[in-house]
Swiss-Prot record:
Domain of life: Eukaryota
GO terms under biological process: erythrocyte differentiation
PANTHER family associated with the record: CDAN1-INTERACTING NUCLEASE 1, SIMILAR TO CDNA SEQUENCE BC052040
GO terms under cellular component: cytoplasm; nucleus
Keywords for this protein: Cytoplasm, Nucleus
InterPro entries, sorted: CDIN1 (IPR029404)
Subcellular location, principal: nucleus
Key word Nucleotide-binding present: no
Protein name listed in UniProt: CDAN1-interacting nuclease 1
Functional summary from the UniProt entry: May play a role in erythroid cell differentiation.
One Pfam entry name: TPD
Length: 272
């Protein structure tokens, strides 16, 4: 779904006055009922992530980590069935999955008398049954399933969307095997025309295309692809600000779905 910049700014302004909780997400949907729920969720997630980046450091000081861990221990001692970690994350205005990671890492340090590897932590976050403490495992699980912006569940959904197949394409991993460093998700073996524009590559983004993220992608990825492979198509599956689709004549198109009016140039030339 495409939004005007004015529509996007209105949504972002609303999000600036609410806490990043599921209750706030419901309020967002009620406030903007005509907008796609998936688009609203993506904008909600991105605005939340901007906030998390600004406050991330303060949650990882030694003092903060110890405070969170002791509050977790005291909380489950009083009531092990209560969503202690989830409520702590909401109180601290911090992502539940990230709070879960902090407490899990502190727990493992205490158990193993050493700093646990990221691989081990990630594995336990994906599958809490590996955690050697049933109460903590349940607390971690509650955080994971109630986090709509971070965590393994969100990563899994994004991975699925970004890997939608294209029968005319050479996939990113194949390109990297050939020695390319920065590569789009797909290179078209046969160029196609979309809305009158020639396309050589497709980049898939499981997010909403707002101004800050799109400008970063242009600088870090899209213009590099354009220089190496020619004109291409970017699909923002959750929509984008329509004013950002301003580089078509230079060779970068934006869409919010896979185009249905593709003309394969090889087929078109054979008909002549």
């Amino acid at each position: 779904m495409k939004l005007t910049k004015a529509q996007y700014d209105e949504i972002a302004q609303f999000l600036g006055h609410v806490q990043p909780t599921r209750q706030s997400l419901r309020k967002l949907k009620e406030k903007f009922p005509s907008q796609s729920q998936s688009t609203l969720l993506s904008i909600f997630s991105q605005e939340y992530q901007k906030q998390i980046k600004r406050t991330h450091a303060k949650h990882h000081t030694a003092e903060a980590v110890e405070t969170y861990y002791q509050r977790y221990l005291n909380g489950v001692m009083k009531n092990a069935a209560a969503p202690v970690l989830l409520e702590l994350a909401n109180e601290m205005d911090f992502a539940p999955s990230l709070m879960a990671r902090i407490v899990l890492e502190r727990f493992l340090q205490e158990q193993e008398q050493a700093i646990p590897s990221k691989t081990l932590i990630n594995s336990m976050l994906r599958d809490p049954s590996q955690i050697p403490d049933g109460v903590l495992a349940n607390q971690i699980y509650q955080c994971t399933v109630n986090d709509c912006c971070y965590g393994p569940l969100v990563d899994c959904i994004k991975h699925f969307i970004n890997n939608r197949s294209c029968s005319l394409c050479v996939a990113e991993d194949q390109l990297r095997a050939k020695g390319y460093d920065k590569t789009p998700d797909f290179i078209l073996e046969v160029p196609v025309a979309v809305e009158g524009h020639i396309i050589h590559w497709i980049e898939s983004k499981a997010s909403f295309g707002d101004e800050s993220s799109h400008q970063a992608y242009l600088q870090d990825q899209f213009w590099s692809y354009w220089n190496r492979f020619g004109p291409g198509l970017v699909i923002y599956w959750y929509g984008f600000i329509e004013e950002l689709d301003c580089h078509r004549e230079r060779g970068i198109l934006l869409k919010d779905c896979f185009p249905t009016d593709i003309v394969t140039l090889r087929h078109s030339m054979a008909q002549r």
